Amino acid sequence: MASDRADAPAQDRSGAISRAGMGIASRSSGGLCSRGRSSAKFLAMRNPTDATAAGDDPLRGTRVVSLAINVPGPVAAARLAALGAEVTKVEPPAGDFLAGAAPVWYEELALGQRVMTIDLKSVAGRAELDALLEQADILIVSSRPSALARLGLERATVCARHPRLCTVSIVGHPSPDSDVPGHDLTYQAEAGLVSPQALPVTLFSDVAAGIDAAAAALALLVGRSRSGVGGWREVALVDAARALAAPRDHGLTRPGGVLGGGSPGYALYPASDGVVAIAALEAHFLARLVGGLGIAHSDASLIAAKIRERRVDEWVTFGREHDIPIAAVAST
């Protein structure tokens, strides 16, 4: 979370990058900095520009300080910013790994936020952070508890110094294993989301945990509005991964499952120039598909033969015209 430099002054690199956004989720926590854990529900959000145009900023005036670098914390902060929160992103002198690894995404996630460099290993840096927290409503951290303790940011200290602060701690595993190291790959592996033949196609655990963390922050704000005190909620990346694995674990997406190849109306089919995804899961969609294709019944081989006759864009248009969920499979 911080570099080895002990004398780096705080630097404001903001210029406020304007606002970014996303969605939501959570599980309960109680009174004065009691510990909670988040589960994985999701609330889709509109484009942040749409929300701004409509004057719909429910978190206007809410101040967020995020010490979380890499992916989960920035995803959470971006979602809160999309709801109107004022976000200050605090980075160590070494910066955020994501800025070098995926600079465009880094900028998108930091959109509209004030970005500062503070060396939290220094006395001056900790004082600078303390001043920010005096005015903040939400704090997002993603270091392991042992690292937070070395910076004087363990739960007991933060709650005692800032009793109204709503703190979300993103960890790999829930307590008492929250000091166990890991990354998105290891959490997905634990949840059974990794194929032995290939790395994951995206950072499912990181992004899902960021969504959960945003929801956890909102839950804490609601709790504070009732009790007058903040709290501390723990969001575990492995929990987020396991939540994403639930459809597979319950058989929906396993081979032969309803969403795993067992339904001819819910499948991928090669067209003449690419591949289309057809999601005619419900009976009315499937009836429209069969009728529109002019085939006798919903046999996968009959559907496949018809789909091969036209281009992808023609099938997308066909789906719109017949009110059937059909999309092109985008290349990566």
Predicted regions and their residues:
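Rossmann-fold NAD(P)-binding glycine/threonine-rich loop
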Residues: 153-162, 166-190
